[in-house]
Protein backbone atom coordinates (compact mmCIF):
# COMPACT_ATOMS: atom_id res chain seq x y z
CA UNK A 1 0.00 0.00 0.00
CA UNK A 2 1.22 3.55 -0.59
CA UNK A 3 1.81 5.98 2.24
CA UNK A 4 -1.51 7.47 3.24
CA UNK A 5 -0.51 9.97 5.91
CA UNK A 6 1.82 12.89 6.49
CA UNK A 7 3.74 13.52 9.69
CA UNK A 8 3.01 17.05 10.89
CA UNK A 9 5.62 19.39 12.44
CA UNK A 10 4.26 18.50 15.91
CA UNK A 11 4.86 14.79 15.28
CA UNK A 12 1.22 13.80 14.84
CA UNK A 13 0.04 11.94 11.74
CA UNK A 14 -2.76 13.19 9.50
CA UNK A 15 -4.42 11.61 6.47
CA UNK A 16 -3.17 13.10 3.21
CA UNK A 17 -6.69 13.98 2.04
CA UNK A 18 -7.41 15.67 5.38
CA UNK A 19 -4.13 17.58 5.14
CA UNK A 20 -4.93 18.83 1.65
CA UNK A 21 -8.40 19.94 2.74
CA UNK A 22 -7.09 22.11 5.57
CA UNK A 23 -3.94 22.30 7.67
CA UNK A 24 -4.68 21.11 11.20
CA UNK A 25 -1.88 23.30 12.59
CA UNK A 26 -2.89 26.59 11.00
CA UNK A 27 -2.59 29.27 13.67
CA UNK A 28 -1.33 26.78 16.26
CA UNK A 29 1.63 27.76 18.45
CA UNK A 30 4.48 25.42 19.34
CA UNK A 31 4.54 25.47 23.17
CA UNK A 32 8.26 24.71 23.21
CA UNK A 33 9.28 27.68 21.07
CA UNK A 34 6.34 30.05 21.35
CA UNK A 35 6.27 30.31 17.55
CA UNK A 36 3.71 29.14 15.00
CA UNK A 37 4.14 25.58 13.78
CA UNK A 38 3.32 26.77 10.26
CA UNK A 39 3.95 30.52 9.83
CA UNK A 40 2.78 30.36 6.20
CA UNK A 41 -0.45 28.55 7.10
CA UNK A 42 0.96 25.19 5.99
CA UNK A 43 4.26 23.36 6.50
CA UNK A 44 4.59 23.25 2.69
CA UNK A 45 2.50 24.65 -0.15
CA UNK A 46 -0.59 22.70 -1.14
CA UNK A 47 0.91 22.18 -4.59
CA UNK A 48 4.03 20.58 -3.12
CA UNK A 49 1.98 18.35 -0.82
CA UNK A 50 -0.12 17.17 -3.77
CA UNK A 51 3.02 16.41 -5.76
CA UNK A 52 4.48 14.39 -2.88
CA UNK A 53 1.26 12.39 -2.65
CA UNK A 54 1.67 11.16 -6.24
CA UNK A 55 3.01 7.61 -6.03
CA UNK A 56 3.63 4.64 -8.29
CA UNK A 57 1.09 1.92 -7.57
CA UNK A 58 2.22 -1.62 -6.81
CA UNK A 59 1.59 -3.78 -9.89
CA UNK A 60 2.85 -7.08 -8.56
CA UNK A 61 6.21 -6.81 -10.33
CA UNK A 62 9.12 -5.29 -8.40
CA UNK A 63 11.32 -2.56 -9.85
CA UNK A 64 15.10 -2.42 -9.85
CA UNK A 65 15.24 0.42 -7.32
CA UNK A 66 12.62 -1.25 -5.14
CA UNK A 67 14.73 -4.39 -4.90
CA UNK A 68 17.64 -2.38 -3.49
CA UNK A 69 15.70 -2.12 -0.23
CA UNK A 70 15.29 -5.01 2.17
CA UNK A 71 12.62 -7.65 1.62
CA UNK A 72 10.91 -6.93 4.93
CA UNK A 73 10.87 -3.18 4.25
CA UNK A 74 9.28 -3.71 0.84
CA UNK A 75 6.75 -6.18 2.22
CA UNK A 76 5.62 -3.76 4.91
CA UNK A 77 5.38 -0.85 2.46
CA UNK A 78 3.23 -2.95 0.12
CA UNK A 79 0.92 -4.43 2.76
CA UNK A 80 0.68 -1.72 5.44
CA UNK A 81 -0.36 1.91 5.49
CA UNK A 82 2.36 4.26 6.68
CA UNK A 83 3.24 7.94 7.02
CA UNK A 84 6.06 10.11 5.72
CA UNK A 85 7.48 13.48 6.76
CA UNK A 86 6.81 15.69 3.71
CA UNK A 87 9.68 18.09 4.46
CA UNK A 88 12.13 15.20 4.66
CA UNK A 89 10.81 13.84 1.35
CA UNK A 90 11.36 16.94 -0.80
CA UNK A 91 14.44 15.33 -2.35
CA UNK A 92 12.07 13.09 -4.33
CA UNK A 93 10.67 16.10 -6.19
CA UNK A 94 14.16 17.43 -6.90
CA UNK A 95 15.26 14.16 -8.46
CA UNK A 96 12.10 13.86 -10.56
CA UNK A 97 12.48 17.43 -11.83
CA UNK A 98 16.09 16.82 -12.90
CA UNK A 99 15.14 13.67 -14.80
CA UNK A 100 12.20 15.36 -16.54
CA UNK A 101 14.36 18.31 -17.58
CA UNK A 102 17.23 16.24 -18.98
CA UNK A 103 14.87 13.96 -20.89
CA UNK A 104 13.96 16.87 -23.18
CA UNK A 105 17.53 16.96 -24.50
CA UNK A 106 17.89 13.32 -25.51
CA UNK A 107 19.69 13.16 -28.87
CA UNK A 108 18.37 11.22 -31.87
CA UNK A 109 20.65 8.25 -31.21
CA UNK A 110 20.04 8.24 -27.47
CA UNK A 111 17.31 6.51 -25.48
CA UNK A 112 15.98 7.80 -22.18
CA UNK A 113 13.45 6.91 -19.48
CA UNK A 114 12.31 3.64 -21.09
CA UNK A 115 10.89 1.07 -18.68
CA UNK A 116 11.98 -2.47 -19.47
CA UNK A 117 10.64 -5.76 -18.11
CA UNK A 118 12.93 -8.78 -18.25
CA UNK A 119 10.45 -11.13 -16.62
CA UNK A 120 11.96 -10.73 -13.17
CA UNK A 121 11.69 -7.00 -12.51
CA UNK A 122 11.06 -3.73 -14.29
CA UNK A 123 13.49 -0.85 -14.57
CA UNK A 124 13.51 2.59 -16.19
CA UNK A 125 17.06 3.66 -17.03
CA UNK A 126 17.91 7.34 -17.33
CA UNK A 127 19.86 7.63 -20.57
CA UNK A 128 21.57 5.32 -23.05
CA UNK A 129 24.09 6.73 -25.53
CA UNK A 130 25.51 4.80 -28.47
CA UNK A 131 28.84 6.61 -27.99
CA UNK A 132 31.98 4.74 -26.92
CA UNK A 133 30.53 1.34 -27.63
CA UNK A 134 27.36 2.01 -25.65
CA UNK A 135 27.23 4.07 -22.45
CA UNK A 136 24.54 3.89 -19.79
CA UNK A 137 24.09 7.03 -17.67
CA UNK A 138 22.31 7.28 -14.34
CA UNK A 139 21.52 10.67 -12.79
CA UNK A 140 21.57 11.07 -9.03
CA UNK A 141 21.09 13.90 -6.55
CA UNK A 142 23.18 13.22 -3.45
CA UNK A 143 24.58 15.07 -0.47
CA UNK A 144 28.33 15.65 -0.30
CA UNK A 145 28.85 13.02 2.42
CA UNK A 146 27.36 10.25 0.26
CA UNK A 147 29.40 11.38 -2.75
CA UNK A 148 32.59 11.28 -0.68
CA UNK A 149 31.81 7.73 0.44
CA UNK A 150 31.14 6.64 -3.15
CA UNK A 151 34.43 8.14 -4.36
CA UNK A 152 36.42 6.71 -1.47
CA UNK A 153 37.30 10.11 0.01
CA UNK A 154 38.03 10.46 3.72
CA UNK A 155 39.56 12.97 6.13
CA UNK A 156 42.80 12.47 8.02
CA UNK A 157 44.11 14.58 10.90
CA UNK A 158 47.65 15.73 10.18
CA UNK A 159 49.93 17.98 12.26
CA UNK A 160 50.39 21.51 11.00
CA UNK A 161 53.85 21.88 12.53
CA UNK A 162 52.59 24.56 14.90
CA UNK A 163 51.65 24.46 18.59
CA UNK A 164 49.05 26.28 20.65
CA UNK A 165 50.65 29.29 22.32
CA UNK A 166 47.91 30.07 24.83
CA UNK A 167 44.94 28.47 26.52
CA UNK A 168 44.33 24.99 27.90
CA UNK A 169 46.13 23.42 24.94
CA UNK A 170 49.26 25.55 25.24
CA UNK A 171 52.28 23.65 23.97
CA UNK A 172 50.20 20.95 22.27
CA UNK A 173 50.52 20.40 18.51
CA UNK A 174 47.90 21.77 16.14
CA UNK A 175 46.17 19.54 13.60
CA UNK A 176 44.12 20.05 10.49
CA UNK A 177 41.88 17.73 8.47
CA UNK A 178 43.04 16.80 4.98
CA UNK A 179 40.84 15.12 2.39
CA UNK A 180 42.43 11.95 1.08
CA UNK A 181 41.44 9.52 -1.67
CA UNK A 182 41.90 5.77 -1.87
CA UNK A 183 39.48 4.77 0.87
CA UNK A 184 36.71 2.15 0.55
CA UNK A 185 34.25 3.01 -2.22
CA UNK A 186 30.74 2.43 -0.93
CA UNK A 187 28.83 2.07 -4.19
CA UNK A 188 27.35 -1.43 -4.13
CA UNK A 189 23.80 -0.12 -4.67
CA UNK A 190 24.94 1.83 -7.73
CA UNK A 191 26.74 -1.20 -9.12
CA UNK A 192 23.68 -3.41 -8.65
CA UNK A 193 21.28 -0.87 -10.13
CA UNK A 194 23.32 0.05 -13.20
CA UNK A 195 24.30 -3.53 -13.97
CA UNK A 196 20.67 -4.61 -13.76
CA UNK A 197 19.77 -1.86 -16.25
CA UNK A 198 22.71 -2.97 -18.41
CA UNK A 199 21.47 -6.55 -18.53
CA UNK A 200 17.93 -5.40 -19.34
CA UNK A 201 19.16 -3.20 -22.21
CA UNK A 202 21.34 -5.98 -23.62
CA UNK A 203 18.51 -8.52 -23.35
CA UNK A 204 15.45 -6.49 -24.31
CA UNK A 205 16.88 -3.82 -26.65
CA UNK A 206 19.78 -5.90 -28.03
CA UNK A 207 22.17 -2.99 -27.55
CA UNK A 208 25.72 -3.17 -26.19
CA UNK A 209 26.64 -1.48 -22.92
CA UNK A 210 30.39 -1.11 -22.37
CA UNK A 211 30.39 1.83 -19.96
CA UNK A 212 28.41 2.62 -16.81
CA UNK A 213 28.39 6.27 -15.70
CA UNK A 214 26.75 7.96 -12.73
CA UNK A 215 26.23 11.73 -13.08
CA UNK A 216 25.75 13.28 -9.65
CA UNK A 217 24.34 16.65 -8.65
CA UNK A 218 25.64 17.46 -5.16
CA UNK A 219 22.81 19.04 -3.18
CA UNK A 220 25.08 20.96 -0.83
CA UNK A 221 27.89 21.66 -3.28
CA UNK A 222 29.76 24.96 -2.89
CA UNK A 223 28.91 25.08 0.81
CA UNK A 224 31.29 25.05 3.76
CA UNK A 225 30.11 21.66 4.99
CA UNK A 226 30.80 20.09 1.58
CA UNK A 227 34.49 21.00 1.90
CA UNK A 228 34.79 19.32 5.29
What label would you give each PLM region?
Residues 1-136, 141-174, 202, 217-228:
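Metal-dependent nuclease catalytic cores that hydrolyze phosphodiester bonds in DNA/RNA
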Residues 127, 197, 212-214:
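Generic low-polarity alpha-helical segments
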Residues 176-187:
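Surface-exposed cleft-lining segments at the edges of enzyme active sites
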Residues 189-202:
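An active-site-proximal "capping" alpha-helix that borders the catalytic cofactor pocket
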Residues 206:
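Conserved acidic
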Residues 209-219:
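Acidic carboxylate-rich catalytic motifs and surrounding loops in phosphoryl-/glycosyl-chemistry enzymes
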Amino acid sequence: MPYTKYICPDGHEVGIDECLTACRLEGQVNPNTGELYCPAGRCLSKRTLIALADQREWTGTPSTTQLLAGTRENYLKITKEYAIDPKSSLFMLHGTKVHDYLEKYTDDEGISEVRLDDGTSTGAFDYYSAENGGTLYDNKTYGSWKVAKILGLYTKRVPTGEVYKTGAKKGQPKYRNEIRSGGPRHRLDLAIQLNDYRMKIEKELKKPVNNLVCEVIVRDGNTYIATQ
